[in-house]
């Protein structure tokens, strides 16, 4: 639903790392994905505490090459499922989203593995050690235009959700729900 709403043929989605279906939806619509996780993220023996961080220099180079108007959105995954759930730091999320927003690029968080990522932020990021998990969660939520999650992770159950900051985004995305999930009036299940 998110890709259907934001991706246009020839547009680019910037990600720290893809998830299979997220990438498939983008490419199905004629967009392309740029995976810009830090180099340490793909080194098995690395002791980097946040191997899911996005490389901000690569992000800036990508935006410069493609043009901000051709970036459909910045998608960050906390943690990066396909490379072992590697966490992303709060500081990295903040810097990446501030940069994207300064150029009018929508910011999206895949929060399907957020609970583990929150633990790593609290225990590995010095500036977050005295914050509660609730406080960190709120701080992260404030960074993004859209947050979505799959509730299937960690055995929570079937389903998921999309949270949007902007009412007009909600209204426009609502039109796509019947094509993929069924009508809102019966819980979005077809």
Show which residues each predicted segment covers.
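Conserved PLP-enzyme active-site core in the AAT-like
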Residues: 1-190
């Amino acid at each position: 639903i998110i890709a259907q709403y934001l991706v246009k043929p020839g547009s680019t989605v910037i990600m720290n790392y893809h998830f299979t279906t997220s990438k498939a939806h983008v490419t199905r619509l004629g967009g392309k994905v740029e995976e810009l996780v830090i180099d340490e993220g793909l080194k098995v023996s690395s002791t980097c505490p946040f191997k899911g961080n996005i490389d901000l220099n690569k992000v800036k180079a990508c935006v410069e090459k493609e043009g901000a108007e051709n970036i459909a959105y910045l998608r960050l995954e906390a943690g990066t499922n396909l490379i072992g759930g590697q966490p992303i730091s709060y500081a990295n999320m903040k810097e990446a989203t501030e940069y994207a927003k300064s150029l009018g690029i929508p910011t999206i968080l895949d929060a399907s593995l957020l609970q583990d990522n929150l633990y790593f932020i609290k225990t590995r990021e010095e500036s977050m050690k005295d914050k509660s998990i609730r406080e960190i969660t709120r701080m992260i939520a404030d960074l993004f235009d859209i947050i979505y999650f799959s509730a299937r992770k960690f055995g929570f159950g079937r389903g998921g959700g999309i949270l949007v900051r902007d009412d007009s985004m909600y209204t426009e995305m609502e039109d796509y729900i019947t094509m993929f999930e069924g009508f809102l009036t019966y819980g979005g299940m077809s």
